[in-house]
Design a protein with these regions (language model features):
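Intrinsically disordered, low-complexity segments enriched in polar/charged residues with Gly/Pro
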Residues: 1-3, 43-45, 88-89
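Mixed-charge, Lys/Arg-rich low-complexity intrinsically disordered regions
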Residues: 1-13, 18-22, 29-32, 103-106
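Intrinsically disordered, low-complexity boundary segments flanking structured domains
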Residues: 12, 41-46
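Residue-level recognition of conserved beta-strand positions in structured domain cores
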Residues: 25-27, 59
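Charged, low-complexity, helix/coiled-coil-prone segments
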Residues: 27, 35, 74-76
Length: 106
């Protein structure tokens, strides 16, 4: 099994290519690592390949905040410089510089 190099990094702010939400990456799976039930719930015509990085996001849209699991092929960098308003931001990240969040060094 070979792993693909991730395009995005922890702390990057990204947006979805097809749906109206954005978020900050807090974890990366270098290939699909969720349930088969979750995977099959995605409509077949938009179901992503499993052999690519998948990202865990603290996500938001105009109405709510939530956590999302998104394939690399469906993400773009978000260069808006707008902060993410997710309530867990301060638990995971210690600050923001430019368009990326960072974790405090131990």
């Amino acid at each position: 099994m070979s792993f693909q190099k991730a395009k995005f990094s922890i702390g990057d702010v990204v947006k979805h290519k097809h749906f109206e939400f954005r978020g900050v990456i807090y974890d990366v799976d270098f290939e699909f690592n969720n349930s088969e039930e979750w995977y099959q719930s995605i409509p077949k015509n938009v179901r992503p390949r499993k052999d690519q990085p998948f990202y865990h996001l603290l996500a938001e849209n105009d109405e709510i905040t939530y956590e999302a699991y998104v394939s690399e092929q469906n993400l773009l960098f978000d260069d808006s410089d707008e902060p993410i308003k997710h309530p867990l931001i301060e638990e995971i990240f210690s600050g923001k510089k430019g368009s990326s969040y960072f974790k405090q060094s131990n």
